[in-house]
UniProtKB/Swiss-Prot annotation:
Modifications made to the protein after synthesis: Phosphorylation activates in vitro RNA binding.
Region described as Disordered: 1-29, 103-324
Domain of life where this protein originates: Eukaryota
CSD domain span: 44-108
GO BP terms in the entry: regulation of gene expression; regulation of translation
Keywords: Cytoplasm, Phosphoprotein, Ribonucleoprotein, RNA-binding, Transcription, Transcription regulation, Translation regulation
Provenance organism: Xenopus laevis
Gene3D superfamilies linked: Nucleic acid-binding proteins
UniProt feature, compositional bias: Basic residues: 123-133, 168-186, 225-238, 263-275
Record CDD domains: CSP_CDS (cd04458)
Name under which the protein is recorded: Y-box-binding protein 2-B
Higher taxonomy: Eukaryota, Metazoa, Chordata, Craniata, Vertebrata
Length: 324
């Protein structure tokens, strides 16, 4: 019984053979499935090729026969082109196979097996993607140290050198074109030099404006609102009054031109008030000089050529003759 038990265990422990996994065969190109080969290494000239649709025709040099070509039949494409294509009038080398509707080209290459040139309408590959990420890599290398790889540096040295330099990198100024187009005011690089100018302007114009200390305490990019600087250049439109017609002539115009624009309205109003009544005041002054003398009887003494006063009113004569 003891001998039979190990045999049973051995039979049980023997692993069963794993079933064989059949890997799918590599599918040949579409134009080469069950197709009969008619000719090899035939040269021809591309008659036309549509890049968008991906097919065209090649004219054989030996038999002058047109052979259909699909973009999947191109074996060696131009490495600079994004899509497979052949250019119009290009000389190519290919194999001829029998298709469903006639002869088709396969394994299309350039003469001698070189890559084809491709169509000029085919898009080129984008080769300069890495340039956008290079500045970040350069800054990381500068922060880590000059001429020292990050592997050679210890963890303590990395923490000491990278920690103080990573903080200012987070507050980088925006690009030049963005700063020039969308933002106005002092640039972040010249904040120290222009701090005094901002404080002087704020004290003279707006006492409630933030000072240089308030700007320094906040972010480096904090600036006063742009409207404050635009108000002094934009003023409401006011129609200018017509120039007054004064007897003085060019003197009044010269004075008006010499004064600033903001003070043109006030002198004009005062000048207008003074200039309107002269004709009326001349008549009114002459009339009161006659009527009060006749009505009230007040003497009006006027100097003569000899310097002695002359009594012009009749009331004055009566007063002098009354005592006699």
């Amino acid at each position: 019984m003891s001998e039979a038990e190990p045999r049973e265990t051995e039979a049980v422990t023997q692993p069963e053979p794993a079933p064989e996994i059949h890997k799918p065969d590599i599918v040949p190109p579409r134009n080469q499935i069950n197709k009969k080969l008619l000719a090899t290494q035939v040269q021809g000239t591309v008659k036309w090729f549509n890049v968008r649709n991906g097919y065209g025709f090649i004219n054989r040099n030996d038999s002058k026969e047109d052979v259909f070509v699909h973009q999947t039949a191109i074996k060696k494409n131009n490495p600079r082109k994004f899509l497979r294509s052949v250019g119009d009038g290009e000389t190519v080398e290919f194999d001829v196979v029998e298709g469903e509707k006639g002869a088709e080209a396969a394994n299309v290459t350039g003469p001698g097996g070189v890559p084809v040139k491709g169509s000029r309408f085919a898009p080129n590959r984008r080769r300069f993607r890495r340039q956008f990420y290079r500045p970040r890599a350069d800054t990381a290398g500068e922060s880590g140290g000059e001429g020292v790889s990050p592997e050679q540096m210890s963890e303590g040295e990395k923490g000491e050198e990278t920690s103080p330099q990573q903080r200012p990198q987070r507050r980088r100024p925006p690009p030049f074109f963005y700063r020039r187009r969308f933002r106005r005011g002092p640039r972040p690089n010249n904040q120290q030099n222009q701090g005094a100018e901002v404080t002087d302007q704020s004290e003279n114009k707006d006492p409630a404006a933030p000072t240089s200390e308030a700007l320094a305490s906040g972010d480096g990019q904090q600036r006063p609102p742009p409207r404050r600087f635009q108000q002094r250049f934009r003023r409401p439109f006011r129609p200018r009054p017509p120039p007054p017609q004064t007897p003085e002539g060019g003197d009044g115009e010269a004075k008006a031109e010499g004064e600033p624009q903001r003070q043109r309205n006030r002198p004009y109003v005062q000048r207008r008030r003074r200039q309107q009544p002269p004709t009326v005041q001349g008549e009114s002054k002459a009339e009161p000089s006659e009527h009060p003398a006749s009505e009230e009887g007040t003497p009006s003494d006027a100097p003569t050529d000899d310097g002695a006063p002359v009594e012009t009113s009749e009331a004055g004569v009566e007063d002098t003759t009354a005592p006699e």
